[in-house]
């Protein structure tokens, strides 16, 4: 490989790493504190990984959500 190819490859790898870090954080910086109203917990024996409203935990078990967007949806609903 020529040195220009190596330099170009390094730039691409660094760009992909930066993009991965940005997507993993949801576009938010570490310094910003996110107000989360939900906590992880089991909502049913068949669905072990759910997000439940912390202030309604044990009172209303139906206030839990699962799935890939469960955390975001839970935070939206619990902050109402």
Swiss-Prot record:
Superkingdom of this protein's organism: Eukaryota
Protein name per Swiss-Prot or TrEMBL: EMBRYO SURROUNDING FACTOR 1-like protein 1
Positions of disulphide bridges: 38-52, 43-78, 50-74, 53-64
Transport in keyword set: no
Tissue: Expressed in leaves.
Signal sequence range: 1-22
Keywords from the named record: Disulfide bond, Signal
Protein family (similarity comment): Belongs to the MEG family.
Organism annotation: Arabidopsis thaliana
